[in-house]
Amino acid sequence: MARQLFTPPITNPRFDPNQSIRESYKNTTGGMQFQQNLHEDQNDNERSSCDGDENSTTGERLENNKSPILTKQEIDEALNTVTNLPPELSKLIDIFIDDLKQPKYVRPLSVLQLSSLFQSFYIKFDKASFQHVSSANNNGYYFSGGGSSSFLAAKETLSSGLSGIFGRSRSSSGNSLMRPRRSSSLFSNESISNSTNATQMLSPEEIKKQLKINELNNMKIEKYMELCERDVFKKILIVGTSVSSPNKMKTFKPHQLQTFKVGNLFRNSVEFTEYNKLLNEKILCLSKLSTMNKINLIKFLSLNNGIDPEPKFEEIKDILYEFTYHSISPCEKIKALLKLHEIMTYSQEMSNDDYLSLLIYYIITIVPRDIFLNAEFIRLFRYKKKLVETESFALTNLEAALVFVEGLTKNDFSNELQDKLTVNESKILENSISSRVSLPSKTAIMHKNNGNNGSNLGDIVTPTIQRPDVTRSNSYDGFRTVFDSSLKNIIGKIRSYTPPHPNNTSNNNLHSSNNLNIPRSSSQLSMELSNRDTTEMSRDGSRSTSSSSRSSASLEHGNREFTGDLTVTASINGADKKEFQKSWKKYKGYKFEDLTICELRDLFEIYQKMMQ
């Protein structure tokens, strides 16, 4: 019987099989490696005893270097000074608003097109804010040893990488072996001490300070973006949303509460306004049913027994009014929405279903008007780069609550309640709003990152509105309008003509022998005759009655001449005339937009034959 070999069990818990395999296939370079491994194995127990302390110390060091902790005092000192935009950034807003007010578009912009313009402006303003903060903090970079080195210049210039390889001498002399070599390590102390071109590296304290400066700069840029949204819509509140009319600037008293009507931005998008109108009617209808005790909202929405909506009712009401009526910019509205979310969260164990049920209860009970347009206003006009994480979560919850309300029908209630509904209430609750009004699709259009910047870690990909092409006056539509009017002018000249009186045949022949037989309209003839009479009046100094009678007679003669020539042509080509009439009358019931290119070419050829 053959002897079987067994591998003894591994008793050391620190034994790593993968490391054993790697060490087994590694080339032996000498006894130093084995001694080093033996020394590490002997001191393994000592290292394991202090692993926890070392890991915690290293973690704290990395945490301090990568994400510096800013105190509240440092943040307040940096942001309290930023109350208004700098003049160069405020000028960008003025230019943007003035550009929107220019009548340079063929038709009024829809809310989706307007949103695309705002998002493009936000990206440009964000870049301009970064440049402004960078230029303002050029002297804020940390300098060490009186040198002119910056954070990005803290590296070795000639002693690292390929430059260190190609910088060496190719001489084969024996002394070159003893010469100190340039190190290829980025953090080599030898290269710093030996190389005169090396730049002093930043210490951990200097790196930490620079990271704090960068974090404060990012906060300043975010503050500038909030002020940008505020100032843009405050100026729109003053100048309006129509084409520029400087004489109709709105003025507000100091104590007057400014109210921004979000619906003005959606007036060119009928789908949104109609959807909002129907949703307002349905919310009001449900509120009346609840007030008349026809439905029990708490029972219908299955609110948790531990949640009582009444104690915070007035506070929630004030926040919803602030959200819908008194806030202006998207950042102000989203702050009110976040505050609403914070107040409604009773405990950490509260599920999202309980939160949605409570939010629906407050919406139906308080009845804030145009809440749908306010939610869409945030979705469209809030800077996409900022509408992430908690902001996106709060807005999505509000949209989910509104979707639940718009989908309610009378079939969702009991038969007893359906019998008590009036005709108007039954009509409102007949169908869902989405089945009656179709909004522009958002699901097929995925979020595009702003500009060419990489997406930050933690950003949530959110559906957004595609940037539709904005039609300008020099577009294809403008060309089609011009072509439309010119061709209609040509077709309008094709009219039936009455034959002249037979007594005027001799006069026509006499007149045709002296003039070229070019068909002209009566308006052209009258202009020529009036110009000729004016010339005669300037020569004689006065205009006689015979001259005016002669002009009217000449005009009548010209008209008969024109129709007479066409009559002669038509009598010669009688068969062709019938064919022409039959060919172009078949387009009598057509609209210009319905004609194809071939049919337009056919009409043009008919016109050319008529003019021959």
Swiss-Prot record:
InterPro entries: VPS9 (IPR003123), VPS9_dom_sf (IPR037191). GO terms for molecular function: GTPase activator activity; guanyl-nucleotide exchange factor activity; small GTPase binding. It is found in: Cytoplasm. One of its GO terms (biological process) is late endosome to vacuole transport via multivesicular body sorting pathway. Residues 55-66, 518-529 have a biased composition (Polar residues). It holds the Pfam family VPS9. Residues 503-517, 543-554 have a biased composition (Low complexity). Residues 273-414 form the VPS9 domain. Residues 40-50, 530-542 have a biased composition (Basic and acidic residues). Keywords: Cytoplasm, GTPase activation, Phosphoprotein. GO terms for cellular component: cytoplasm; cytosol; endocytic vesicle. SMART domains: VPS9. Residues 40-66, 494-560 are annotated as: Disordered. Its main location: cytoplasm. The modification Phosphoserine is found at residues 67, 163, 185, 245. Putative GTPase-activating protein. This is Protein MUK1. It comes from Saccharomyces cerevisiae (strain ATCC 204508 / S288c) (Baker's yeast). The gene is MUK1.
